[in-house]
Amino acid sequence: ISQVLDTKSSMVSGADALPDSAEAPELEFRHVSFRYPQAGADALTDISFCAAPGETIGVIGGTGSGKSTLANLIPRFYDATDGQVLVRGEDVKTLQLQALRTRIGVVPQKALLFSGTIRENLRWGSADASDEALWDALRAAQADGVVRDKKGQLDAEVEPGGRNFSGGQRQRLTIARALVRKPELLILDDSASALDFATDAALRKALSKLPWKPTVVLISQRVSSIRHADKIVVLDDGHMAGLGTHTQLQ
């Protein structure tokens, strides 16, 4: 464990602060390609699209098409092999890593909850969040009913891995945790896959009405989940097979 903790990250932080505002798109991929170390082929090839502040970008494709890889390049979990990923017109490689990541909310495919209480889990998003802010996030994530049904509500126990919650409940709680931070850029990586269609639709409606109007990257294998996005990126084996609205792509 000590060796792991002492290992230095190969990800070098940039020096620039994230601009408070810019006329440039909130998010832009500019001819981005990515190849994993020792891989024989690119996982992503020549991906280009942009999202204005407050827009929702849908990303769809089959298993192994590169959706999660695309998501991981935005907060610099990996760096693009070629091309640029830009936030507010600035290459993410030039930005201070902490400043970049504190403005991004990422909800991965596998919902992860920690041992403790629901309140403690949600406050990983923002340590000083008020109970009112927690309930606001829960309502937006369609998780307030889940918490109200638990004895103790916000003080209800969360077992290791969230095993005392269903898959759909864990997903909604992890989305709520991301919303507590009020991120300016929200990445949902197939993180509503366990939700029924009605709850998924209610979640998307709530996200569109968030008062701080985040830019949303919504990754899904369900057409119904992304059909109302402002733009849809269609991935096929790491290549961009389409870009446009649902109507344009039909």
Question: Which functions belong to the PLM regions below?
Answer:
Residues I1-V4:
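Cytosolic ends of transmembrane helices, especially the final helix of ABC transmembrane type-1 domains
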Residues D6, M11-G14, D20-Q250:
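ABC-type nucleotide-binding domain
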